[in-house]
Amino acid sequence: MKENELKNEKSVDVLSFKQLESQKIVLPQDLFRSSFTWFCYEIYKSLAFRIWMLLWLPLSVWWKLSNNWIYPLMVSLLVLFWGPVFVLVIFRLSRKRSLSKQLTQFCKEITKSTPSSDPHDWEVVAANLNSYLYENKAWNIRYFFFNAMGCQEAFRTTLLEPFSLKKDEAAKVKSFKDSVPYIEEALGVYFREVEKQWKLFNSEKSWSPVGLEDAKLPKEAYRFKLTWFLKRISNIFMLIPFLNFLCCIYVSRGMCLLLRTLYLGWILFMLVQGFQNIRVLIMSMEHKMQFLSTIINEQESGANGWDEIARKMNRYLFEKKVWKNEEFFFDGIDCEWFFSHFFYRVLSAKKSMRALSLNVELWPYIKEAQLSCSEESLA
């Protein structure tokens, strides 16, 4: 009994130490009012912004000395409107260049902190890298990463996806040089942590729906899919694109009928694509794991199976406050298309789709889900 009590006390001490350690972490999200104010501060402190401001000194002298105001005005307008664009471009390139020079240290921090796909696990990595980059004069302020999600996204776009897409060792060495062994070690640590998370979803079934027999799919509530879609685009996510579509209708009133039909059809198609992309963008890695686990563990096959998966995921995403109601998927066909388009198709092509993630850490589980679908269709 005493030994058990001592073990429990030790485990509590370890947990409390970790909690205290996490409380000590200070990131820019704790210091700035929003990511926008942090971004403005970053721009203000950048060299490109200072150069842009200094350009106004010779321009003001030119205005005083010149007898013809047209040329100074033209140059001033160019500097005024194009200057901020160049400042932003140079700022982005500077961030990318600074981080690319510190890949080895990035990997060391990942190996030491052992983060998983949970964004909170990346807080320590983000804080340590912020300090390291500033102290080693790789960045001019202490706030390189705004929060843990920014650090995780940088890992994904800088290390995880580019490295995973390299086909052979020579290509990896050519792109990442001496950082290759450190990257391999960091990715190994990350994949092990992701696998632990996956086991919680797939083996222990951490979530199970209650009262699902009363749940209805949107196809049972709406007569047409178009009415469901129009209701969806009325939310805040699609308000600006929808207003843009109405503006396009007004602008195209002078076109001939054929051109107007083609133009508005293309705009509507882009609007639908935007809506489809938003659905996958708001899903975290946890939600994607639950989706794949639900597919793998579904007992029914065919259309009924996908309808059941759609019901479960509609309930799950509503309970997790990802979606405002239980209408994320219209029906089983929509659910199957979603899996095929945003998961299996990306895996097959191994090429990112615009701003969408490759989901590299989910590749083994996507294959498993696709295999279970194939087995069900053959059964």
UniProtKB/Swiss-Prot annotation:
Transmembrane annotation, as ranges: 43-63, 70-90, 233-253, 255-275
GO CC aspect terms: cytoplasm; endosome; fungal-type vacuole; fungal-type vacuole membrane; nucleus
Bilayer topology: Multi-pass membrane protein
Pfam families attached to this UniProt entry: DUP (PF00674)
Cellular localisation: Membrane
GO biological process, one term: protein transport to vacuole involved in ubiquitin-dependent protein catabolic process via the multivesicular body sorting pathway
InterPro entries named in the record: DUP/COS (IPR001142)
Keywords of this entry: Membrane, Transmembrane, Transmembrane helix
Main location: membrane
Entry similarity comment: Belongs to the DUP/COS family.
Record's protein name: Protein COS4
Organism: Saccharomyces cerevisiae (strain ATCC 204508 / S288c) (Baker's yeast)
Lineage, uppermost ranks: Eukaryota, Fungi, Dikarya, Ascomycota, Saccharomycotina
